[in-house]
Amino acid sequence: MKKAILTILLCGVMVLGMTGCGKSKNEFDIGNKSDIKVSQNDVIMTIKEGTLTNKSATLVLTNNSAKNFQYGNPYEIEIKKDGEWHKINVELYFNMPAFQLSARENKEIEINWENGYGKLAKGTYRIIKGIDYEYEEGKYETFNVAVEFNIE
């Protein structure tokens, strides 16, 4: 009887030990230096004042041109380490609708990255979104916009 209880306790300790060895939801794998080029010409992206937390923000896309653009749900977050931007290795899944950003228009986008990135730790980050411009029917040029932010 004592052996059975001891075996059950030992198994319980092993299971708890194994589950404690993984990464917590607030840690992530920092990848290679980023090679993403960012443009802030016709379209800029900002964070709406008062909306930034360590797990979400409201982005504002502002079209400062007479052109029409499109964007989707995908985004990525990078972290600044030693003065360089680095990718964060996570698997993200997005629905792929296309949204219009008409000439001189602003659009607010609420994002919650907790499921993909977890709660961000103290540091400097940037959110990157791709923007598409149809320069000829069926032909698109894609560029990236980004906004930097700090988590205290």
Where are these regions (language model features)?
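Positively charged n-region of N-terminal signal peptides that target proteins for export
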Residues: M1-A4, I8
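C-terminal motif of bacterial Sec signal peptides marking the signal peptidase cleavage site
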Residues: G17-G20
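Primarily secretory-pathway and cell-envelope proteins
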Residues: G22-N95, Q100-S102, G130-E152
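Intrinsically disordered, low-complexity Pro/Gly/Ser/Thr-rich segments with frequent PxxP/GP/PP motifs
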Residues: L92-G118
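Exposed beta-sheet edge/beta-hairpin loop segments within beta-rich domains
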Residues: G116-K122, E136
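A short tyrosine-centered beta-strand micro-motif
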Residues: L120-G130
